[in-house]
Amino acid sequence: MTKHIIVIGGGLGGISAAIRMAQSGYSVSLYEQNNHIGGKVNRHESDDFGFDLGPSILTMPYIFEKLFEYSKKQMSDYVTIKRLPHQWRSFFPDGTTIDLYEGIKETGQHNAILSKQDIEELQNYLNYTRRIDRITEKGYFNYGLDTLSQIIKFHGPLNALINYDYVHTMQQAIDKRISNPYLRQMLGYFIKYVGSSSYDAPAVLSMLFHMQQEQGLWYVEGGIHHLANALEKLAREEGVTIHTGTRVDNIKTYERCVTGVRLDTGEFVKADYIISNMEVIPTYKYLLHLDTQRLNKLEREFEPASSGYVMHLGVACQYPQLAHHNFFFTENAYLNYQQVFHEKVLPDDPTIYLVNTNKTDHTQAPVGYENIKVLPHIPYIQDQPFTTEDYAKFRDKILDKLEKMGLTDLRKHIIYEDVWTPEDIEKNYRSNRGAIYGVVADKKKNKGFKFPKESQYFENLYFVGGSVNPGGGMPMVTLSGQQVADKINAREAKNRK
């Protein structure tokens, strides 16, 4: 008899797991509370402006392509992606600008401000991150290893310690190899992919630089939601039954097993396995009603990653100095991280990510106008949340900074504005305290690991998404879905012996 898999949540991790389970011959039902598939890969359109509500950067497209290849199909028949050799532009408070290109040689050619020594150091750092990336790929990615003990067992103690570089933080690894202060800050902010601090995260996450340099940075034509639409189409073709606008209210259990879910309609649906794309702590808290003592223990080790104050701006002018992806850096990177991740306050001088897809895709804004998305990282929702007045002051601070750093009269040119706070993120995606990136990567608290993909409390409950390994970011959450499918397939194969 065909076994039934229930997937809770249609984010990239959930839809990826659903596709792989269906490709493996299981009956799969996916329940998503929103009316779209993709989770935070969402879309907002108004007044002829188009915005990616969630992620704006596509890296490591091969992870997505694999899902189509399992079905003997090509992703290019479903969605079009475009490589961006000019990966991003970095603006610094003193007026310095650095353009990051795919390739160290190209970066050197386009930045007269960088010396021969800077480029040599950058190449040395890339070589270091390549070594980490390669060993991480062997175990952490290919086999879905979930804990430090599993990694030590797989690679051996000495090999794991040296090649994963668990001795240093990410910023220490950068500062050891890079002397240019601008490059130090730019490379440190690669930690944005997992919503953490480069001063707290383990050096193993330096691999993010090599991943982007080797695999490239891509744009999904028409908006990144088209990638989610492509995965939804593939899932339906593979026989996944998708229920949008349907919320799972709780998970039923018997002893150490989950038995099914109760929907908001009152219907009970049985399952042999449940895969939750809802974050781990909200799943335990709201769907399984885990006791407070165990929840508190989990929250201490697996603290939420950062959230964001997300502004979507329709602007009645053009700023030629902007690239597709831009970063407006802070005067004091350490203080910015300290305020967000330790003091838990809205930062005085935030580093700001600004994406302007209109630079690549002119369909995203009216002629002569620009669609500007602004994202500084801020703390997740605290026990005493920020007030409307706090956010209003922070908005002014952001606009002041952008105008000061070259976006002249930005306020005057805003003709459309839509803002998302951590409270909006929590409400729409049921994320833990409004975090965008799942669990924070912290060398002291969790060695940079997120939750294991297998539940420690229930034998047939699995998790995917940003709160589990291999981590946040679109390719990683998609990979988590494939890894969970591999784990269930291996378990079933073992049971059949």
UniProtKB/Swiss-Prot annotation:
Keywords recorded for this protein, A-Z: Carotenoid biosynthesis, FAD, Flavoprotein, Oxidoreductase, Virulence
Pfam short name (any one): Amino_oxidase
GO molecular function, one term: oxidoreductase activity
EC numbers on record: 1.14.99.-
Residue ranges of coiled coil: none
GO BP terms in the entry: carotenoid biosynthetic process
Transport is among the record's keywords: no
Binding locations of FAD: 7-19
InterPro entries: Amino_oxidase, Carotenoid/retinoid_OxRdtase, FAD/NAD-bd_sf
Pathway the protein takes part in: Carotenoid biosynthesis; staphyloxanthin biosynthesis; staphyloxanthin from farnesyl diphosphate: step 3/5
Catalysed reactions, as listed in the record: all-trans-4,4'-diaponeurosporene + 2 AH2 + 2 O2 = 4,4'-diaponeurosporenal + 2 A + 3 H2O
Required cofactor(s): FAD
PANTHER family according to UniProt: 4,4'-DIAPONEUROSPORENE OXYGENASE, PHYTOENE DESATURASE
Functional note: Involved in the biosynthesis of the yellow-orange carotenoid staphyloxanthin, which plays a role in the virulence via its protective function against oxidative stress. Catalyzes the oxidation of the terminal methyl side group of 4,4'-diaponeurosporene to form 4,4'-diaponeurosporen-4-al.
Similarity section: Belongs to the carotenoid/retinoid oxidoreductase family. CrtP subfamily.
Alphabetical list of NCBIfam families matching this protein: crtI_fam
Protein name from the UniProt record: 4,4'-diaponeurosporene oxygenase
Origin organism lineage: Bacteria, Bacillati, Bacillota, Bacilli, Bacillales
